């Protein structure tokens, strides 16, 4: 994987061994699990070659097909530079003709309402994913979900922004890169309530059977935002694993549980964080952190130092 420098050293344990997680776009320390870098973009080809012959066969010119462009990136553009094949400047009536051709090409590419709506939806999806710093493959999954919803006519009568937000939220859950509804709403043009409604409608319409998000999936991201050690994150995961085994987490929000487990783990490891700090990172209220904290401490019999 390009981008992992051999001179890089883990700031926690001093290791120089790292693992690249392509699903999450993260570089992680192989020994302690500390996230060294997030949102890493793999700029290499999506194919692999083990000999020169394979490389020659699989290499190709042009950008790969993508669901993130309304025509899947299969169209060809007339070059914006007024030059011929030899690099000479085109002048006079030929230049005017080229300009008219470009204008008609733009019009013909998006020539009906459905195409315009799809182009707008995918541009919104790209904007939101960029603001949330989500990896490219996740955007492709979200675009695929949105296109399926269009084909099944689920978009009719609903806001484009709401359904795009729902597709992005569903893609995050499918790919194991959890983002809360609050986080999606923070970059969307519609409310959290509308995103939730649109998501449930899309899930029913497309038959998406997504498992509930585990609170453990939020620990690393929340822990990094709080600046706690790898030990604290590991302890928080142990607390949550035990809580899941005993059925304590059933029916409770995963973000609140992750926040409470991190709060407890930080206290146990001597890295005290306030309930307000933890609540802000997890996008929950201090009351939620406090309630989940009490439940975990009491039901797991944890002795927390005061």
Swiss-Prot record:
Family assignment from sequence similarity: Belongs to the TFIIB family.
Pfam families per record: TFIIB, Zn_Ribbon_TF
Protein function: Stabilizes TBP binding to an archaeal box-A promoter. Also responsible for recruiting RNA polymerase II to the pre-initiation complex (DNA-TBP-TFIIB).
Positions annotated as Sequence repeat: 123-206, 217-298
Residues binding Zn(2+): 10, 13, 29, 32
GO cellular component: transcription preinitiation complex
Keyword Cell cycle carried by entry: no
GO BP annotations, alphabetical order: DNA-templated transcription initiation; transcription preinitiation complex assembly
Top-level taxon of the source organism: Archaea
Organism the protein comes from: Thermococcus kodakarensis (strain ATCC BAA-918 / JCM 12380 / KOD1)
Keyword annotations: Metal-binding, Repeat, Transcription, Transcription regulation, Zinc, Zinc-finger
UniProt name for this protein: Transcription initiation factor IIB 2
GO MF annotations in UniProt: DNA-binding transcription factor activity; TBP-class protein binding; zinc ion binding
CDD domains found in the cross-reference section: CYCLIN_TFIIB_archaea_like_rpt1, CYCLIN_TFIIB_archaea_like_rpt2
Positions annotated as zinc finger (TFIIB-type): 6-37
Keyword field contains Zinc: yes
């Amino acid at each position: 994987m390009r981008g992992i420098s051999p001179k890089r050293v883990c700031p926690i344990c001093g290791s120089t061994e790292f693992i690249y997680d392509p699903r999450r776009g993260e570089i992680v320390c192989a020994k302690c699990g500390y996230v060294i870098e997030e949102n890493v973009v793999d700029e290499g080809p999506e194919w692999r070659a083990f000999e020169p012959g394979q490389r020659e066969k699989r290499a190709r010119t042009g950008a790969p097909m993508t669901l993130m462009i309304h025509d899947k990136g299969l169209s060809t553009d007339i070059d914006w530079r007024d030059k011929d094949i030899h690099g000479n400047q085109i002048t006079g009536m030929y230049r005017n003709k080229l300009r008219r051709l470009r204008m008609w090409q733009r019009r013909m590419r998006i020539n009906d309402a459905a195409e315009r709506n799809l182009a707008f939806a995918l541009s919104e999806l790209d904007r939101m994913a960029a603001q949330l710093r989500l990896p490219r493959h996740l955007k492709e999954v979200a675009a695929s979900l949105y296109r399926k919803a269009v084909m099944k006519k689920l978009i009719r009568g609903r806001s484009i922004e709401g359904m795009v937000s729902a597709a992005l939220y569903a893609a995050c859950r499918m790919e194991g890169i959890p983002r809360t509804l609050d986080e999606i709403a923070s970059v969307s043009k519609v409310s959290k309530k509308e995103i939730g409604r649109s998501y449930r409608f899309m899930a029913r319409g497309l038959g998406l059977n997504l498992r509930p998000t585990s609170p453990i999936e939020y620990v690393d991201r929340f822990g990094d935002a709080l600046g706690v050690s790898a030990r604290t994150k590991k302890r928080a995961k142990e607390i949550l694993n035990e809580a899941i085994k005993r059925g304590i987490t059933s029916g409770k929000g995963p973000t609140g549980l992750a926040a409470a487990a991190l709060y407890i783990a930080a206290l146990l490891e001597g890295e005290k964080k306030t309930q307000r700090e933890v609540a802000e990172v997890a996008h929950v209220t201090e009351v939620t952190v406090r309630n989940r904290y009490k439940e975990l401490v009491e039901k797991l019999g944890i002795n927390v130092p005061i």
